[in-house]
Amino acid sequence: MVDVQYKNVSEFPGWSKMPQFIHDFIQRNGIKTVIEIGAGANPTLPIDTINKLGISYAINDFDVHELSKSSDAYIKTVFDPCSSNFYHANTYDLVFSRMALEHVSNAKTFHKNIFGILNPGGYAVHCFSTLYALPFVLNKFLPGPISNILLDIFNPRDRSRHEKFRAYYDWARGPNHILIGKFEALGYKVVNFTGYFGHPYYKKIPLLNKLEEIKSAWLVRHPISYLTSYGSIILQKVR
């Protein structure tokens, strides 16, 4: 039985809550070896936390330049988990990603490759944005220059540390039985699948933001999977 939940975006672990979320997950499950996919310039756990946990913690990106922005104290691995001829020698108790899954161009290949680098009983944990929340529909279908302008208006950030990458949203949806079946067909057990309603992109427009908050509160009580804005999923390798 899959644990499916729906929550408000304020509980989404994919941003500032992620370090504590992953820290607690590692401790709770006796994790010893970890790799963060798509960490690039912004690894989730700081080096001192990694040392206190006593774990091996590698960070990954397919872009050498992005990895070069992070401290050399990290174990760095360059590979593309979407590659059809993927090979990576090491295996891990935990593979996780933060706001990277929406940028995966071929989700089936990605999740198959991640499955291959998990130890038996190991976990894959992902936090990601989903369709069909309006901001992400626009992000997917608008030309890059226009979506860049909108991002700078509604959610400005330091591009040297948080670059904007193309989003595909392949398998990036809220909880639904079709998607759960796809993960199970690859050999995963879906431990938990949570959808989150709401987003921060209307904060500069108070009335619109208030309406979004009202809508999100209603959707938590009456969930519609395809209207989630974000998702988190915990998968386990069981075969």
Kindly label every feature range from the protein language model:
Residues 7, 11-15, 103, 168-173, ...:
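Aromatic-acidic/polar surface patches that form glycan- and anion
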Residues 45-47, 69, 106-107, 135-137:
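Short glycine-/acidic-enriched loop or helix-start segments at secondary-structure transitions
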Residues 94-105:
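A short SAM/SAH-binding and catalytic strip from SAM-dependent methyltransferases
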Residues 108-109, 113, 123-236:
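S-adenosyl-L-methionine-dependent methyltransferase catalytic module, highlighting the catalytic core
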Residues 104-105, 118-120:
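Helix-to-beta-strand junctions that scaffold the AdoMet/dcAdoMet cofactor pocket
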Residues 1-90, 94, 228-231:
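Conserved N-terminal segment of class I S-adenosyl-L-methionine
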Residues 26, 112-116:
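Short amphipathic alpha-helices and their capping/turn segments at secondary-structure boundaries
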Residues 40-44, 63-65, 101, 130-133, ...:
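Short, solvent-exposed loop/turn segments at secondary-structure junctions
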